[in-house]
Amino acid sequence: MSEPARIAINGFGRIGRSFLRALYENGYRDSVQVVLINEPAASEAIAHLLKYDSSHGRFGEKVTQSGDALTVAGDNIALTHQTEIEAIDWRAHEVDFVVDCTGVFGSQADGQLYLQQGVKRVLFSHPGKPDVDFTAIYGVNEKELTVDHKVVSNGSCTTNCIVPVIKVLDDAFGIDSGAITTIHSAMHDQQVIDAYHPDLRRTRAAGRSIIPVDTRLARGIERILPHLEGRFEAIAVRVPTTNVTAMDLSVTLNSDATIEQINQVLREQSERQLAGILDYTEEPLVSIDFNHDPHSSIVDGTQTRVSHKRLVKLLCWCDNEWGFANRLLDTAKTMAEQTEH
């Protein structure tokens, strides 16, 4: 067996920590080894928040920390606390590639800063700029990812949730146009109590209001499914929950369909080509029931509606942290297998 790829995580917030936990929970340690975490926060806080998580519970692996050294399940991980890519000596840690979970960097130029310092590839855990080499959405285009793609984005949690569903409908019935409302749990860029923020809506207490926010989801769909350019629009609101997101999808089909036909196609795909990525349920569930669910998207078949044979409404759920972190891990594992180390 070849040695595991040596990777670094830059940014150890909600997604960075979920990614590391998913790596161990899924048994991927033999193919991917985290050797460095860069996070400006104190080392003690890094270890504490890895051990204890308000949404996902206690981490099942033993975690210890001494100075700027973290040990997870016996694996040693170095800690650094920089804010700039160039300030980190990636070569000294023999890093093969970086999973960037900062939410700050995301352009080709940012990726090149890593490559110039000996990193072979970089994977952004958030939507990249249009100039990145590739945006990978598992279940849709991951087979097109090659070793020549050096600067890669994993898209967003909402793109990963909705694009596989859109592709299933488009392949089966054809899509003329669509509109999406993302009903997203509160995030770190919101306020606990009213406080200043450049976005005036996000100056308001996250636990007290449903808050509209900007989204570029429609443009993300176009990047993955370019033949649907100009056919989708999206809005988003944040709601007073800490995790799990619902997506309200409305599409106009190119051919007639019934509720039963639509649900059958989605159910079949969840059991076949999209098993592990798309799930389907008809249980009377609520958002908390999808907490720590590893799927990109879960279609609630009880909420499927059809008007005039072609206007379709669907409700899809996702754990916007855990589901996305699992897809990030899938992409990282694929990149590790492709990359010489």
Curated annotation (Swiss-Prot):
Its EC number is 1.2.1.72. The active site is at residue 157. NAD(+) binds at residues 14-15, 320. Pathway: Cofactor biosynthesis; pyridoxine 5'-phosphate biosynthesis; pyridoxine 5'-phosphate from D-erythrose 4-phosphate: step 1/5. One of its GO terms (biological process) is pyridoxine biosynthetic process. Substrate binds at residues 156-158, 202, 215-216, 238. The keyword Oxidoreductase applies. Coiled coil: none annotated. Its main location: cytoplasm. It catalyses: D-erythrose 4-phosphate + NAD(+) + H2O = 4-phospho-D-erythronate + NADH + 2 H(+). The keyword Secreted does not apply. GO terms for cellular component: cytoplasm. It is found in: Cytoplasm. Keywords: Cytoplasm, NAD, Oxidoreductase, Pyridoxine biosynthesis. Pfam families: Gp_dh_C, Gp_dh_N. It comes from the Bacteria. Transmembrane segments: none annotated. GO terms for molecular function: erythrose-4-phosphate dehydrogenase activity; NAD binding. SUPFAM superfamilies: Glyceraldehyde-3-phosphate dehydrogenase-like, C-terminal domain, NAD(P)-binding Rossmann-fold domains. InterPro entries: E4P_DH_bac, GlycerAld/Erythrose_P_DH, GlycerAld_3-P_DH_cat, GlycerAld_3-P_DH_NAD(P)-bd, NAD(P)-bd_dom_sf. SMART domains: Gp_dh_N. Belongs to the glyceraldehyde-3-phosphate dehydrogenase family. Epd subfamily. Homotetramer. Catalyzes the NAD-dependent conversion of D-erythrose 4-phosphate to 4-phosphoerythronate. This is D-erythrose-4-phosphate dehydrogenase. It comes from Idiomarina loihiensis (strain ATCC BAA-735 / DSM 15497 / L2-TR).
